[in-house]
Amino acid sequence: MKKQILGVLLGLSVVLSGCSSQSTESMLQEVKKDTKEIKSGKVTMSLSLSDEKEGSKGNTGYEMSGDEKFDPLELKMNGKFSGLGKDLEVEDYIKDGVYYTKNGVGSKAVWFKKKGPTDNKHALSFKSGSLNMNDDILNLLDKKDNWDVTKDGDKVTFKLKKTDELKNKVKEIHNKELKKELKFSEFDYNIEYVFNKKTNDIEKLYFDLSIKTEGTTSKATNKGSLEEINKEVNIELPEESKKARELLA
């Protein structure tokens, strides 16, 4: 009788283990599918460039946030550009294939415009600028061993591991996107997907990438997040944008 009970318990543990594994795999596939189908969201994007030789004087970059709609690309972003020890407030739009930017505030504000990207790619676009929505990164969701999993109630966070194999893969993907063959003295990343298992929906995407190329003293850190996924986004241009000057470059 004791052996029979032990046999039943062993069988149950195998079944439960299989269910747990299948549950993780099915969630990863849902994350992959949902991410490919994202149409809009609330975006944050930032870039920080620093140089060891220049110290804080050489720090440049931007911090922007706003709404983005994919295919065709439309966005509204507010934030600041930093450089030479100064911050410049900016407001950027892409609407109907035209890129608009407002530099400065109040009476000193100046509007510029130029033809927008024809390939739906832009530095401030989460879809084209993030690691999360890259097809090669999404393919890594096919293997659950690639991911660390943490659970908080109904929310499950999948974070790409940092094994040598995966780090080399991310380097390869990054170079492929840049169409360059760079070698790095520093390379670190975080790539996360937050999934709500109750609603069966993706809730948040996050990434950061910090790199230093061999033979240089400069370091670049890029970060981004996408939340309020598939929110309704209606981009309206301010009246003053009608007076925007044409950008030559």
What is the role of each PLM region?
Residues 1-8:
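Positively charged n-region of N-terminal signal peptides that target proteins for export
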Residues 11:
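Nucleotide-cofactor and metal-assisted catalytic machinery
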Residues 15-18:
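C-terminal motif of bacterial Sec signal peptides marking the signal peptidase cleavage site
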Residues 20-249:
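Subset-of-secretome marker
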